[in-house]
Amino acid sequence: MELYFLRHGKSVPRSDWDGDDESRPLTEAGVSAMAHAAWTLARLGVTPDVLITSPLERAQRTAEIVAPALGLEGRLSTERCLGKDFGMKQLRRLLRQHSRAGSIMLVGHNPAFTTIIHKLTGGHVALSKGGIARVHLAARKSSSAELVWLLQADELVGLASSNSSPPSVAAQDTEAAEPAQD
């Protein structure tokens, strides 16, 4: 089984947001970077069977940007357990629920993702906002796995820029984004 841990894109800083943390959106730069990332992931042949996202706005938006590029429209699901308290117990439950899938992409948050990757692989990783890690899990019940690759957000954007122009996100998709500072 292949697991992709995609951390949500760059979001509006808490200090600049008057609403609750759950509704904090991506910045305009975060939306743009995730569009580049989605294009790069498609070019790399990333084709998960299932895309599962946290219910928090910034993760939802990230998943909405990535899904069409990876051919996952209609296969996006939201799981409350992918919120900030996501851990091994919740991961095992998701793996059981999607036992027929060969690969799963999870869109969520740190420190949960880096903690789980460490528990699975034994390695310490840093996962930037908009970064992704691919982990190979040999057996679904195993707590042992291999980190196949890790791409930070700037690497995904760089790969997109070096190949050709990735598609931009439609103007309507960026209207909800807040200022690009942070």
What are these regions (language model features)?
Residues T62-V66, L91, I116-I117:
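Hydrophobic packing residues within well-ordered alpha-helices of enzyme cores
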Residues T121-E146, Q152-L156:
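Domain-level recognition of soluble alpha/beta enzyme cores
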Residues Q97-A133:
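Non-DNA-binding regulatory cores of transcription-related proteins
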Residues E2-R80, D85-F86, G123-L127, N163, ...:
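Active-site-proximal alpha-helix that buttresses catalytic centers in soluble enzyme cores
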Residues G83-Q97:
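Short phosphate-binding loop-to-helix
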